[in-house]
Amino acid sequence: MSKRGRGGASGAKFRISLGLPVGAVMNCADNTGAKNLFVISVYGIRGRLNRLPSAGVGDMFVCSVKKGKPELRKKVLQGVVIRQRKQFRRKDGTFIYFEDNAGVIVNNKGEMKGSAITGPVAKECADLWPRIAANAGSIA
């Protein structure tokens, strides 16, 4: 769970099961032209020997585009996780998971590069990132 370095995030972040370790590839859910995002590192993870840093819903991470527009590929970018397949527990006791892992490309202030998001955005992510919530079609 990232505790530091969440750029434009607002509010407190609760413990969420981390489902996307370094090396994971997820869908890009915005309209920037990127198809896949490859996780390079996760902001705010201090870590432990031999443990891979992992990201969960609402975490900001460093990524690169593996498939998509040529002008986005082979560059180091920032992204935020908006959905994950690994289930996590909400404060009301319910467990939730999504059918895919997805993220969006943001700048270091937390503002989206794209202008629209396909599919739902987790409520935990929308609470932390107001600019992502503004572009979300639905919040689950």
UniProtKB/Swiss-Prot annotation:
Sections of the chain in a coiled coil: none
Keyword Ribosomal protein: yes
Alphabetical list of SUPFAM superfamilies matching this protein: Ribosomal protein L14
UniProt keywords, alphabetically: Ribonucleoprotein, Ribosomal protein
InterPro entries associated with the record: Ribosomal_uL14, Ribosomal_uL14_CS, Ribosomal_uL14_sf
Any GO molecular function: structural constituent of ribosome
GO terms for cellular component: cytosolic large ribosomal subunit
UniProt-listed SMART domains: Ribosomal_L14
GO process terms (BP): translation
Protein family membership: Belongs to the universal ribosomal protein uL14 family.
Protein name: Large ribosomal subunit protein uL14
Organism: Caenorhabditis elegans
